[in-house]
Amino acid sequence: MRTVCLVKNQQPLGATIKRHEITGDILVARVIHGGLVERNGLLYAGDKLVEVNGVPVEGLDPEQVIHILAMSCGTIMFKVIPVSAPPVSSQTTVYVRAMIDYWPQEDPDIPCMDAGLPFLKGDILQIVDQSDALWWQARKISDIAICAGLIPSNHLLKRKQREFWWSQPYQPHTCLKSTRSKEEFVGDGQQFFIAGFRQQHANMRCTCSCYSAVGAPYEEVVRYQRQPADKHRLIVLVGPSGVGVNELRRQLIGCNPSCFQSAVPHTTRSPKSYEMDGREYHYVSRETFESLMYGHRMLEFGEYKGHLYGTSVNAVLAVLDEGKICVMDLEPQDIQLARTRELKPYVIFIKPPSMSSMRHSRRNAKIITDYFVDMKFKDEDLQEMEELAQKMESQFGQFFDHVIVNDNLQDARAQLLSAIQKAEEELQWVPEAWVSPGAES
């Protein structure tokens, strides 16, 4: 038997306990990384508790033992029977981007709710312990000083996703937004919506990838810094129609065309008399265009007045090969097609300001469509823009590297230039597959 003395402070002890299913013994279930118990180094997972501050724990429930600990102040004395062989830690720290939201308070399966770590889509997590197949220990890099918390393992979340998926009634393939309620914390990050017409052409792509497999809840990431000899990263602008994405892209390229350039799109229509192949468009046959589509070499595509239009991976690479920064706008559901090792996109979400700000800044702005010319923004248009932005951020925010609120076009352009400079010059979190030798993206 061993006596362990801990001085309790304002922080949790950093350990969980459980009752052995057969013997009824109270055991240390796990030691939380960075907590008081781990720093003390005298209690290990598997140790049997005999006494706490002189009170025998035999026959007590774990909740009763926790109550004794909660009522204790200052020094806490444990009498324990050590595990026969203390675990040897050989954990490798891994960093991941969360692709889902997680709330421990809404998870009935978590072993200890108080030890749970809540996180949101896009958060970068440092996973410090994967020894448990179901519950990992992690901390947010924004709160690296605090002790770790419990998060569901990749295996557990995927299992929950599959169980949820198969428990739902069959619905026809509609490509409409998912009707999942907010309470379900294990969303798969693949809920989509109809984004409406783009000004150039309607997107004919099935927007939801609703026949695809369950998405990975975590994406392993590493720090990446572009070197001078490397190609520039593709800059992707995303935002609801009317927020100013096209205008920002146009102004960005116009302010420095030797640095920034758009990719030349492809089309199946015939060139007009004043057009030149490779300048306005790459003019190709429908067969060639569809071959690029089915080969996943089209980042975006759509059909307009019977003709196909789209931007290919090769067209983007042609700009990057010239040593320029390629800037393009994408619908959010197309971001994943661009997230490859060869393009390494930096995704910037252009977000509308408040309704009152939009009424002021866009009171003289016009909507130009195929049906109306110089149609002013109405409150319904602004409301739709705001709601669409919220949906984009909610469903695709894990892919956004930076967010700019376009309250003022001049300020937004300055922020855009600054964000691109940081993407080019500073360390950024990117998928591990983008930089690992021999990895496939």
UniProtKB/Swiss-Prot annotation:
One Pfam family matching this protein: Guanylate_kin
* InterPro entries assigned to the protein according to its UniProt record, in alphabetical order: GK/Ca_channel_bsu, Guanylate_kin-like_dom, Guanylate_kinase_CS, MAGUK, MPP4_SH3, P-loop_NTPase, PDZ, PDZ_sf
Q: Which GO terms describe its biological process?
A: protein localization to synapse
Q: Which residues form the Guanylate kinase-like domain?
A: 232-421
Q: Where is the SH3 domain?
A: 91-161
**What are the record's GO terms for cellular component?**
adherens junction; basal part of cell; cone cell pedicle; Golgi membrane; lateral plasma membrane; plasma membrane; presynaptic membrane; protein-containing complex
Locate the PDZ domain: which residues? Answer: 1-84
Q: Name one GO molecular function term.
A: signaling receptor binding
Keywords in alphabetical order, please.
Coiled coil, Cytoplasm, SH3 domain
Q: What is its main location?
A: cytoplasm
Question: Localized where?
Answer: Cytoplasm
Q: Which SUPFAM superfamilies match?
A: P-loop containing nucleoside triphosphate hydrolases, PDZ domain-like, SH3-domain
Q: Which residues cross the membrane?
A: none
List where this protein forms a coiled coil.
373-430
Question: Keyword Coiled coil, does the record have it?
Answer: yes
Q: In which tissues is it expressed?
A: Highly expressed in brain and detected in lung, and bone (at protein level). Also expressed in intestine and spleen.
| SS bond partners | none
What does this gene product do? May play a role in retinal photoreceptors development.
Q: Which family does it belong to?
A: Belongs to the MAGUK family.
Self-association state and partner proteins as the record states? Interacts with MPDZ. May interact with GRIA2. Forms a complex with CRB1 and PALS1. Interacts with FASLG.
Its recorded name reads: MAGUK p55 subfamily member 4
Originating organism: Rattus norvegicus
Tell me the classification of the organism that encodes this protein.
Eukaryota, Metazoa, Chordata, Craniata, Vertebrata
Gene from which the chain derives: Mpp4
